[in-house]
Amino acid sequence: MDMGNMGMGMGMGMDSGHNHSHMNMGSGHGADSGHACRISMLLNFNTVDACFLSPNWHIRSKGMFAGSIIGIFFLCVLIELIRRLGREFDRWLVKRAGVNSTCGELSSVAEYGKDGAQGGAVVRVAPRFRYVPSWPHQILRGFIYGSQFTAAFFVMLLGMYFNVIVLIFIFLGQTVGYMLFGRDTCGGGFDFGAQGRCC
């Protein structure tokens, strides 16, 4: 069989005017070709027929899209709540252990003035302690961290759909969540618990 004359183009043996609209191009989920998932790797404003994370999350109406956006917003707020709960749990562990993490010991050190004269200054030295949580507490800390990380990972995957509306609500959700639950991280002194660390 001589294949030298055969072209490898898409029109090979097909009439370009042939109508395929009667064919079901769905993936077995009962979807017809008019409601296929639209996924774009460029910035887009797709609302109806957008799909997120799986074919089951197929947006079929504007109301469904609005519900998804509201859910994404609250997922981002939830991430900040989980972070706050983790910090509060760490503070509770340190406090329960009887360790004062915000006060260090006072120490006298030499201080030299402009004229070279030596004088004494009292400074607060950072606390020197190492608190190691018990295994049950560490397992609970791990679950708190893992749930926060998992939710943040799903938000990152949602952002990779480059839907401008989704991105705006991700930014708004994280901002509102931080405004509501991030006030404990602003302090004058260094607080181990506020930094999310207990050791």
UniProtKB/Swiss-Prot annotation:
Its main location: membrane. Disruption phenotype: Exhibits a significant reduction in survival in macrophages after activation with gamma interferon. Keywords: Membrane, Transmembrane, Transmembrane helix. Signal peptide: none annotated. The chain crosses the membrane at residues 62-82, 152-172. Induction: Expression is highly induced by the CUF1 copper regulatory factor in response to copper deprivation and repressed in presence of physiologically low concentrations of copper. Expressed at high levels after phagocytosis by macrophage-like cells and during infection of mouse brains, but only at low levels in lungs, consistent with limited copper availability during neurologic infection. One of its GO terms (molecular function) is copper ion transmembrane transporter activity. InterPro entries: Cop_transporter. It is a multi-pass membrane protein. The CTR4 copper-sensing promoter can be used to construct plasmids that offer efficient and regulated expression in C.neoformans. The keyword ATP-binding does not apply. Pfam families: Ctr. The keyword Hydrolase does not apply. It is found in: Membrane. One of its GO terms (cellular component) is membrane. PANTHER family: COPPER TRANSPORT PROTEIN CTR3, SOLUTE CARRIER FAMILY 31 COPPER TRANSPORTERS. Belongs to the copper transporter (Ctr) (TC 1.A.56) family. SLC31A subfamily. Required for high affinity copper (probably reduced Cu I) transport into the cell. Plays a role in fungal pathogenesis during host infection. This is Copper transport protein CTR4. The lineage of its organism: Eukaryota, Fungi, Dikarya, Basidiomycota, Agaricomycotina. The gene is CTR4.
